[in-house]
Structures are given as C-alpha cells and as structure tokens.
A protein has these predicted regions:
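Glycan-recognition and catalytic cores of secretory/periplasmic carbohydrate-active enzymes
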Residues: 1-178
Length: 178
C-alpha cells in the first residue's frame, strides 16, 4: 500500500508503474484462483508457494483497490468478485487450527482481529462499494458489534472464534496464538 500512497503524493509515473506491477503480481500470482485454496493467498519464500501459509490477508482486496479505482481494470473487478465471500474458506482452512482444539470450540473456525478479520473487511468493503450490496455492509457491522462485546473491545487480544456463515466473532481470551 505504501507504494500507492507514494504515487498519490508524488504523481511519479515510475512509482505508479512499480505499484501496478506489484499489484498485478500479487493479485494474479500470489492468489489462488482455482482449487481448494481458492480465495486465499500464499506468501512465498525463495520460490513461489514455498510457504505453507495460506491466508485471506495475502489475497485481500485492499492491496489492489488503488489500481482498480485509478484504472477501472476489469480483471481486478473479477478478482474482487472471487474474494468477496472468501470467509467461507475458513470452514476448511482455520487460520488457528494448530493452536486450538476443535472439539472445545463453539464456532467452526477462528479469525484473528488483525490479519484475518480485517482482511475479510477489506473484501466486504470493496464489494459494498462496487455493488452497493447491503449484505457486505452487514457483515462488517456484525463483526464490529461482536468486537465491541469483548472485555477491552479491539485491544482485548486478536483471537476470536469465527462463524463464516453468520460472520459472528466470539472472543476467546488473550491466548496470543498465531
């Protein structure tokens, strides 16, 4: 994002070209468009897909909104459509599955308030802006209300159980996992 802000501040064509290339790479190469990880992104090490980390935050629409709104690129619109409901991938790919016992959970998955839920919000906000579909606005509001119920609200800690179908969050304490 910092490259886009640098371009907006400077108007420098070189910075635009660099930010555009990074956005295109990240949206096309680092995001799964088919298969069991569709809607997720993969960090990469020395070679692409070298990391077992498959997460929504790597694919989130927020990384590419500047390019979309500056150019109207239809391909990015297609990618945003792929991502707008990617919370459902959390049913199969719980980002905190290695840290919590499934049998003790109330909701079927987890979402950290920072890297997971905020990434989903980025997708929902983009879907709401582009299509004025109130469902995406409601998903954001549901999560905000749930976070407000945590003892210290947003600063309570990052770990929440998450229901991808209702988009509700359930605070589970300050375990600092993930």
């Amino acid at each position: 994002l910092w490259l886009w802000y640098a371009f907006l501040r400077s108007g420098n064509a070189y910075v635009f070209d660099l930010a555009e290339r990074l956005s295109r790479h990240a949206s096309e190469v680092d995001v799964y468009h088919i298969g069991k990880f569709k809607g997720m992104g993969s960090r990469h090490n020395v070679s692409h897909w070298g990391c077992p980390c498959k997460e929504a935050r790597i694919a989130m629409a927020g990384h590419h909104r500047f390019l979309y709104y500056l150019t109207g690129d239809r391909r990015l619109g297609d990618i945003f459509d792929e991502l707008k409901d990617n919370e459902l991938t959390f049913l199969e790919h719980d980002p905190l599955a290695d840290f919590y016992a499934k049998e003790e959970m109330v909701y079927p998955s987890h979402a950290r308030s920072g890297p997971d839920w905020s990434s989903l919000c980025s997708n929902w906000m983009t879907a709401w802006e582009r299509g004025n579909d109130e469902r995406y606005h409601q998903k954001i509001l549901i999560g905000l209300e749930d976070i407000k119920q945590a003892p210290l609200q947003l600063v309570s800690g990052p770990d929440f159980e998450f229901d991808p179908e209702s988009c509700h969050l359930r605070y589970i304490g300050e375990c600092a996992a993930g």
